[in-house]
């Protein structure tokens, strides 16, 4: 194992170029940026924890949701792809029983005393709760984990719908898994992260984000049994045809104050399920749902019913999207992407907050996307939890410059990201 200084020298000399190219692509421009980025992270580690420490460096990708908007928590299907935007973590094991994590862009150094296993007062919704919950998740599986010191630098946009939280969680989990020789597989790590987010952080999330960051590639998941979802990996290579670029636009409004809006989607879907004898919509007979619409409207209200309609139709679309990608039929996939986007807007109603109609960044981004991309073979939709954050578009290369310029005119320079899908999940890089 090398020291932080030795790794910086090796990176600058190009000795880790092959490992970086496998994650980010092999162009000299890309490699130069990643050499600089990794070197800076190692320098920051030394600043906070001192020089001369033996370290390992990890990468945890963000994800873009490709299908299955708000279906996973109802025990439906999900489809997502890992992307080249990621979190990089430099870590070194310690023997004092504390986990210390300093994250770029945040002033606070998280210090977790591992003798305090229970959720701590005032810690929920903060990164410290995730770290504590992940450590406890390992212990619940019989893993004897201890302390480490880490510095993280994330390019995954916070509150953007690219799942910065899952990347952070998976980075922490991979550090513990590697430094303490736990040997847990990627799905097990993802479940630990979900446990931490649900129980310690206090967010009722599904599992798709963590699974995609853990496994990489394009991931199709069946959550009929959410404790043991069936997953199928579609290799990222060839998913996007030649001449098509994945663009993600940050509308620069955060998800961070929207937990109540997200929770309402789940609670309303589950209210409909309860009227039909189930806990979630995945347990409900769809034919009976359509037959009992008048009663459901009366008992649950129209928005809840519309969100349930979205679930059933989106679930079927997600299965069709998987089949289209597996068959290499991007045109069919793109048509389904558009339908998914319209359903999120019209039925799930998670493109803007009804209580704040003056602020509709996602709506504006989708409208401009439609004006540019309609009839071109491209596609566009909102992604993630919704209400704010990012939209996703598949843009023909000939239109990328025009498309990005239009997005930047609305949301400012640097808002439009050109992404690639990433084959690797969360890994130790060096």
Go through each PLM region and give its residues.
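C-terminal nucleotide
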Residues: 1-63, 88, 92-124, 220-381, ...
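A short glycine/serine-rich beta->alpha loop
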Residues: 53-54, 70-77, 116-124, 154-162, ...
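Glycine/serine-rich anion-binding loops at beta->alpha junctions
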Residues: 59-75, 155-172, 376-394
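Structural signature of FAD isoalloxazine-binding scaffolds in flavoprotein oxidoreductases
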Residues: 76-96, 215
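Beta-strand segments within the central parallel beta-sheet cores of soluble alpha/beta enzyme folds
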Residues: 100-102, 147-154, 184-195, 334-339, ...
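Glycine- and acidic-rich phosphate- and metal-coordinating loops
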Residues: 135-157
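Phosphate-handling active-site elements
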Residues: 140-148, 176-192, 397-410
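Fold-level recognition of mixed alpha/beta catalytic cores in primary-metabolism enzymes, strongest
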Residues: 160-248, 430
């Amino acid at each position: 194992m090398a020291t932080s200084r030795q790794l910086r020298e090796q990176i600058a000399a190009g000795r880790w170029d092959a490992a970086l190219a496998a994650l980010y692509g092999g162009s000299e421009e890309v490699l130069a940026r990643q050499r600089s980025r990794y070197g800076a992270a190692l320098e920051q580690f030394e600043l906070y924890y001192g020089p001369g420490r033996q370290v390992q460096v990890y990468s945890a990708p963000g994800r873009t949701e490709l299908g299955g908007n708000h279906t996973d928590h109802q025990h439906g299907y999900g489809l997502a792809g890992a992307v080249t935007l990621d979190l990089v973590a430099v870590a070194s094991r310690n023997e004092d029983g504390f986990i210390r994590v300093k994250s770029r862009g945040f002033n606070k150094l998280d210090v977790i005393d591992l003798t305090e296993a229970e959720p701590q007062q005032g810690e929920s919704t903060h990164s410290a709760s995730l770290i504590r919950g992940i450590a406890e998740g390992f212990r619940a599986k019989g893993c004897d984990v201890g302390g480490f010191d880490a510095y993280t630098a994330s390019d995954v946009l916070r509150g953007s719908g690219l799942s910065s939280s899952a990347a952070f969680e998976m980075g922490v989990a991979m550090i513990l898994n590697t430094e303490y020789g736990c040997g847990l597989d990627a799905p097990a790590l993802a479940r630990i992260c979900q446990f931490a987010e649900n129980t310690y952080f206090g967010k009722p999330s599904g599992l798709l984000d963590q699974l995609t960051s853990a496994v990489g590639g394009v991931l199709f998941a069946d959550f009929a049994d959410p404790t043991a979802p069936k997953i199928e990996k579609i290799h990222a290579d060839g998913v996007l045809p030649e001449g098509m670029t994945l663009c993600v636009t940050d509308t620069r409004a955060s998800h961070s104050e929207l937990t109540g809006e997200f929770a309402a989607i789940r609670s309303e879907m589950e209210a409909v399920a309860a009227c039909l004898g189930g806990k979630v919509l995945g347990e409900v007979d769809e034919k009976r749902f359509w037959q009992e619409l008048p009663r459901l409207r009366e008992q649950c209200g129209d928005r809840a019913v519309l969100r349930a309609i979205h679930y059933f139709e989106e679930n079927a679309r997600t299965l069709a999207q998987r089949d289209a990608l597996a068959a290499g039929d991007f045109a069919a996939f793109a048509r389904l992407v558009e339908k998914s986007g319209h359903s999120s807007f019209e039925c799930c109603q998670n493109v803007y907050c009804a209580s704040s109609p003056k602020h509709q960044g996602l709506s504006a981004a989708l409208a401009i996307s439609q004006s540019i991309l309609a009839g071109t073979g491209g596609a566009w939709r909102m992604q993630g939890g919704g209400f704010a954050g990012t939209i996703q578009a598949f843009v023909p290369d000939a239109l990328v410059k025009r498309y990005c310029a239009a997005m930047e005119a609305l949301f400012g320079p640097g808002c439009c990201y050109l992404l690639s899908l990433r084959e690797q999940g969360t890994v130790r890089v060096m």
